[in-house]
Amino acid sequence: MVSRWLAKIANYLTNELAADLFGTGEATPTRIYTTLQPWQDTLWQIAARAMGWEILDTRRPLPGDLFVTNILGSEASDALDTGAHVLAQPAQYLSFAWDGPLDGALDGLAEIAMQPDALVIDTPPLLVQARDEALAGTRPSAPVQGSRVALLWDARTGAGQVLDQWMQGRSVVIIDPHAVSPDRLTQILATEDVDGGLVTYQR
């Protein structure tokens, strides 16, 4: 499932947004910023980095930038006014489409769903480079054991942490610290059969 959606997103970024369809030589968008759920952020950021896109921390878009969001509010409106591309993606699991007016944005799930399930573009750069860029100089604070770990979501380096653990053959449980209180961590680790414990990253 994960590989299918990573491929769909990578195909969309390259074939729909970064393609020079008319051979004009004009600059194509290669910058993206998101306000999504952690699991959605992970997929978008890993796919974008693998295709050479820049992940923006700023909320000041330029024409041609891509903004993917769960909320169509003033931020999305400002991005559209600037000339950025805006995709609306529902926050709920198992959603198939955006439920409500799009107000100039595009339905993110509908756009992605039309893409092939396998890469139809040139092989992306090695994921090692994408991982290292996403980790921004951080590393696990202690040796990691087990086959399944938990990570506290960090908006800046979370996607890199997930990719780092995936590349070492581990499955990952993403915990949003804004939605889960610390006293529930032990229960979550047990319920999710996390044998590698909670992994933290630091410089």
Name the predicted role of every residue range:
Residues 38, 72-74:
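Short beta->alpha connector loops
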Residues 1-19, 118-146, 150-153:
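Conserved AMP-binding/adenylate-forming core of the ANL superfamily
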Residues 13-52, 144-167:
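Conserved AMP-binding/adenylate-forming
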Residues 43-48, 75-83, 160-165, 184-189:
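Short, aromatic/basic amphipathic alpha-helical patches
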Residues 74-108:
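A short, gly/pro- and small-residue-rich
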Residues 54, 61-71, 132-142, 146-203:
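AMP-binding/adenylate-forming
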Residues 94-130:
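Serine hydrolase/lipase
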